C-alpha cells in the first residue's frame, strides 16, 4: 500500500530537525544497579531468508508489493529522522528530504527484503499510530509498541521483535543516582512518554513520586530530564542506552531481577508489557503470519545484536 500523508509535513519537518545530529560517541550505560554496555555492533545477525518465491499478492495491504509502515521517526534508537541516506536509512514519504533509520527501520527492511517488497516509511505521531492501522492508512506499525492486552484488542500483533526491560534514567549528579530499588525514587519528580506502560503502569508504583504530565515524545521526555524539569524518567532499556550513549551525564537505573523492580501480577503480564511487537489491522492474520515467519528466524540474542547496531549509528539527539 502506498500512502502519502502530506498534511503532517510541517510538523514532521520540525521533528526531523530535532532528531538530526552529528558524530556518534561509543555507547555506554552506567547505573547503581547495572552496567548496560552494548555488545559490539559486529555481533551475529543472521542473513535474511529469501522468501521471494512466496505468492503474497493476496495479502491485504501488500497486494501492490509495497509495505507502508508507520513510526514516529523520533524514538531513538527504535527510530529517528536524519537528513541523508547513510547507514541504510529509508526516505520518509511524507517528509521530503528526510530519512528514517533505527532498529524499527532495520526490522522493516529485513521483512521487505525477505519477500521482495518495497518499504515505505510514514512519519506519524505516537497517538495516531493505532488509529492509522484501523483506518487502513498504514499496513503496519513498527514503532517500539508493547504487546499489551489493550493494544492487542485493537490490532493484530506480530512478534515479539524485541524483548525489552523497564529502567529509569537520571543524571549522574542526581540524589537518585544511587537508587537500588523503585522505593528509593520516592519524592522525585518524574515522567515518561504518553500512551506507554512506563507512564500508565510503572510510575504509579513509585510511592511518593511526584508524577508530572506525560511527555509527547521520547525526545521531549529526555529533554525534561536534561533541563532539570524532572529528576528521572521511566522507559525501556534500548531508549535508555541510546540516551546515555549521546549524553554521558545520564545514568541508567535498572532494578531487573530484584524485589525492588516494577511489579506485575504474573510473569506473563510482565512479558506482555515489555515485549515489543508489530501491529497490523485486526483480522489481517495473513500479514501478521508473513511477518512472524521472518521474525521467528531470529532469537533474543540476535535481536539484541541488531539493536546494538542501531545504537552504534544513532545520531546525536
Please place each PLM-identified region on the residue numbering.
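C-terminal motif of bacterial Sec signal peptides marking the signal peptidase cleavage site
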Residues: 15-19
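Bacterial signal peptide processing site
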Residues: 21-24
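Extracytoplasmic small-molecule ligand-binding "clamshell" domains
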Residues: 31, 36-144
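Ligand-binding clefts/hinges and TM-proximal coupling segments of bilobed small-molecule sensing domains
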Residues: 42-50, 56-60, 197-214, 286-317
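Bilobed "Venus flytrap"/periplasmic-binding protein-like clamshell domains
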Residues: 73-76, 97-113, 145-146, 165-222, ...
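Acidic, polar ligand-binding/catalytic clefts
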Residues: 109, 113, 118-184, 258, ...
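Alpha-to-beta junction loops
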Residues: 117-118, 134-143, 188-189, 226-239, ...
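Periplasmic-binding protein-like
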Residues: 162-170, 246-292, 315-317
Amino acid at each position: 500500500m502506498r500512502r502519502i500523508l502530506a498534511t503532517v509535513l510541517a510538523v514532521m519537518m520540525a521533528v526531523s530537525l530535532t532528531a538530526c545530529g552529528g558524530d556518534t560517541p561509543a555507547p555506554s550505560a552506567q547505573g547503581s544497579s547495572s552496567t548496560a554496555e552494548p555488545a559490539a555492533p559486529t555481533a551475529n545477525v543472521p542473513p535474511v531468508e529469501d522468501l521471494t518465491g512466496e505468492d503474497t499478492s493476496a495479502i491485504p495491504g501488500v497486494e501492490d508489493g509495497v509495505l507502508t509502515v508507520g513510526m514516529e521517526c523520533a524514538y531513538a534508537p527504535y527510530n529517528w529522522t536524519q537528513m541523508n541516506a547513510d547507514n541504510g536509512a529509508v526516505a520518509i514519504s511524507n517528509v521530503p528530504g528526510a530519512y528514517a533509520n533505527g532498529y524499527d527501520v532495520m526490522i522493516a527492511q529485513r521483512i521487505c527484503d525477505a519477500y521482495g517488497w518495497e518499504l515505505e516509511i510514514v512519519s506519524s505521531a505516537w497517538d495516531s499510530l493505532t488509529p492509522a492501522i484501523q483506518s487502513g492508512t498504514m499496513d503496519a506499525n513498527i514503532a517500539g509498541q508493547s504487546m499489551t492486552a489493550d493494544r492487542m484488542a485493537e490490532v493484530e500483533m506480530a512478534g515479539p521483535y524485541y524483548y525489552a526491560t523497564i529502567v529509569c534514567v537520571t543524571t549522574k549528579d542526581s540524589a537518585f543516582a544511587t537508587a537500588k530499588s523503585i522505593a528509593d525514587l520516592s519524592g522525585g519528580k518524574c515522567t515518561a512518554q504518553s500512551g506507554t506502560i512506563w507512564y500508565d503502569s510503572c510510575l504509579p508504583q513509585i510511592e511518593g513520586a511526584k508524577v508530572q504530565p506525560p511527555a509527547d515524545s521520547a525526545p521531549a521526555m529526555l529533554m525534561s530530564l536534561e533541563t532539570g524539569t524532572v529528576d528521572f524518567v521511566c522507559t525501556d532499556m534500548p531508549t535508555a542506552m541510546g540516551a546515555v550513549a549521546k549524553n554521558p551525564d545520564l545514568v541508567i537505573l535498572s532494578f531487573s531481577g530484584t524485589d525492588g523492580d516494577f511489579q506485575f501480577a504474573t510473569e506473563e503480564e510482565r512479558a506482555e508489557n515489555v515485549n515489543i511487537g508489530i501491529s497490523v489491522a485486526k483480522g489481517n492474520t495473513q500479514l501478521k503470519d508473513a511477518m512472524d515467519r521472518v521474525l521467528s528466524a531470529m532469537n533474543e540474542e540476535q535481536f539484541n545484536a541488531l539493536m546494538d547496531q542501531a545504537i552504534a549509528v544513532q545520531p546525536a539527539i
